[in-house]
Amino acid sequence: MARIAGVDIPRDKRVEVALTYIYGIGLTRAKTILTKSDVNPDIRVKDLEDGDVQKLRTALEAFTIEGDLRRQEGMALKRLQDIGCLRGRRHRMSLPVRGQRTRTNARTRRGARKTVAGKKK
């Protein structure tokens, strides 16, 4: 396995697809990186030469990926929660943030059902 940006990317996949194993890189960004670094997207990772891998590493330095991106996203959520805006409060309460209904649905975001005792007659 080639190790790029601290991630072991699979050897048997095409470079274009293998780059998507890095957090923060999708197919479109992978294609952009490959064209900038002048690497053929159709070859397999195991067939890459050391020079090609080095080109990919230098091209990846221009993007925020992996741990830095995760930290940046976490800090953005924490900022929303600290300033007490609606989005931050909704994140804190594990409810949908973008205005979706919660009376029904929203089961994924709210988690498993919590049974509440019924009213006595």
Swiss-Prot record:
SUPFAM superfamilies per UniProt: S13-like H2TH domain
Source superkingdom: Bacteria
Region feature Disordered, mapped onto this chain: 97-121
Residue stretches of biased makeup (Basic residues): 100-121
Residue intervals passing through the bilayer: none
MF (Gene Ontology): rRNA binding; structural constituent of ribosome; tRNA binding
UniProt keywords, alphabetically: Ribonucleoprotein, Ribosomal protein, RNA-binding, rRNA-binding, tRNA-binding
A biological process from GO: translation
GO CC terms, sorted: cytosol; small ribosomal subunit
Listed Gene3D superfamilies: 1.10.8.50, 30s ribosomal protein s13, domain 2
Keyword Transmembrane annotated: no
Family: Belongs to the universal ribosomal protein uS13 family.
Subunit comment: Part of the 30S ribosomal subunit. Forms a loose heterodimer with protein S19. Forms two bridges to the 50S subunit in the 70S ribosome.
Biological function: Located at the top of the head of the 30S subunit, it contacts several helices of the 16S rRNA. In the 70S ribosome it contacts the 23S rRNA (bridge B1a) and protein L5 of the 50S subunit (bridge B1b), connecting the 2 subunits; these bridges are implicated in subunit movement. Contacts the tRNAs in the A and P-sites.
The protein's name: Small ribosomal subunit protein uS13
